[in-house]
């Protein structure tokens, strides 16, 4: 191993989102994992974090990831099984609302990223995270601003996290009808705010968020009950 490790990475022109990953693989730092989260700003439902390792070669079947910022729901659903099929490894972690309340969003997010990387069946040589540094990883890592539009492995992780969470929120609507979880996915919208005012928060809401906390302080009734209709394993981890 050279005295200076990891070695300086030289970026050369490559195809689509693979430039950064290709440079890391060329310098012997693969496999490269991307990690991203969904649900950070929602006031209900879990925080979902995914880690994904793609191979060093560009796959035509995943070419749509080059434009991940513009992906609609149908395209994400189409890519979801393709990513799971061709990824060298992936792992999805679900952090429930009560843990988000207890830890705080940022700390829960960092912990989720650590768990997602630790759960990979292939140990990465390097980790690319979307937006901010993930301390405590046992391998080199790099935060990438706008990572889901800059690195294919982060874009793939973003799709895995988004589809997994959206499906869970649809199931949550069946358990807690009236809130519109299937539509707004737990984010604050006028319809969600109106439902909260009428029904009060349920067990899936984040009581540390001010719009929910205000209702609790005002004495709005709370609806208990947990999610029961999710796919097996979706309340914890998938990988």
Swiss-Prot record:
Pfam families: RNase_HII
Catalytic reaction annotation: Endonucleolytic cleavage to 5'-phosphomonoester
Record's function text: Endonuclease that specifically degrades the RNA of RNA-DNA hybrids.
Cofactor note as given: Manganese or magnesium. Binds 1 divalent metal ion per monomer in the absence of substrate. May bind a second metal ion after substrate binding.
Cofactor(s) it depends on: Mn(2+); Mg(2+)
Family: Belongs to the RNase HII family.
Keyword line: Cytoplasm, Endonuclease, Hydrolase, Manganese, Metal-binding, Nuclease
Protein source organism: Mycobacterium sp. (strain KMS)
The protein, known as: Ribonuclease HII
Origin: domain of life: Bacteria
Alphabetized InterPro entries for the sequence: RNase_HII (IPR022898), RNase_HII/HIII (IPR001352), RNase_HII/HIII_dom (IPR024567), RNaseH-like_sf (IPR012337), RNaseH_sf (IPR036397)
Any one Gene Ontology cellular component term annotated for this protein: ribonuclease H2 complex
Entry's localization field: Cytoplasm
Entry EC no(s): 3.1.26.4
Limits of the RNase H type-2 domain: 30-221
Gene Ontology annotations of biological process type: DNA replication, removal of RNA primer; mismatch repair
Broad class of enzyme this protein falls into: hydrolase
Positions of a divalent metal cation binding: 36-37, 130
GO molecular function terms attached to this record: manganese ion binding; RNA binding; RNA-DNA hybrid ribonuclease activity
